[in-house]
């Protein structure tokens, strides 16, 4: 056992390590890893450079490494496909950085009313934006939200097949397949890909009709989709799914809803999407989140895997309280017997989302949506004039488009 203490790790003091090992009845740290086969363990010390001698040297080293980064703050960026460098108003960062919210402490179901109220505002504002009444607290990502929604639909219908567009983001499709589980698992859900029209990048309606049937639990469609196209026949897709006894799950970019119709208006049963455009920075793989929303009906509410926030009158006249509801049916309440499994890694972003939505309001969303439409179509026309560059679908998109 090393006798050298690490300056930033109190438990690295040799006497403390010895006391902890004695408490658990272990003779050495190596004994803690005996369950790992010997041929899977590294039998030599790690080849690490010499330790930096001081905090000042560590700071210089980190600043030197960070100076090599290239960010979207200093370069024109066309990054997208699920994570975008939208402007984040300073007030979003200010509020989520406050000590009332930026804390590892988790309140009980009926305490912590300030944070609970902020979460309630997130749910109610997002519900108004997407045209739905019941919005759960966010999950890890857009893909996780889609996976959970498909599992909800399978439980609701008792069917084990979902139709998705062949144009779906490959990474999101991989997450969905993971949620639908391997074929050997009894709760496996078969993922069937529906062709898309190469001329418009929209779902091929003929192929959808051919594959929609009595085994279909849900049709999952995104608008705008991964290739950027707006699914102009989303209402007809919902009608066909309903006629087949299937649920319609619609995935959206919420920032598009200042100019596009909310999914609730054209027949969506379950709505999912990303929360990242709503006041959250791109952040090295972080900063993402997904939401799930439905109508406020018992059959849907009982299938939510997420934590949910509700409002109730109190004994004080005109006063209201905010707290968790339906927690017993989640993995928080029932553990392995819960409807599904989720975590709380993006709840802070829900507060940033609420601040962003309240700051913009309906007119702000319309303004942002129109600006995105104007700039994306301007960019498409400008790129199409470049020799050797082709934009195969020149219209019918919101923010993103394909370039050959």
What spans do the regions from the language model cover?
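Charged, compositionally biased N-terminal leader segments and the immediate start
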Residues: 1-13, 18-20, 315-318
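Short loop-beta-helix segment that forms the pyridoxal 5′-phosphate
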Residues: 107-112, 127-148
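N-terminal entrance/gating region of PLP-dependent enzymes' catalytic architecture
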Residues: 15, 34-121, 127
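TRNA-binding/sensing appendages of the translation machinery
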Residues: 26-40, 268-273
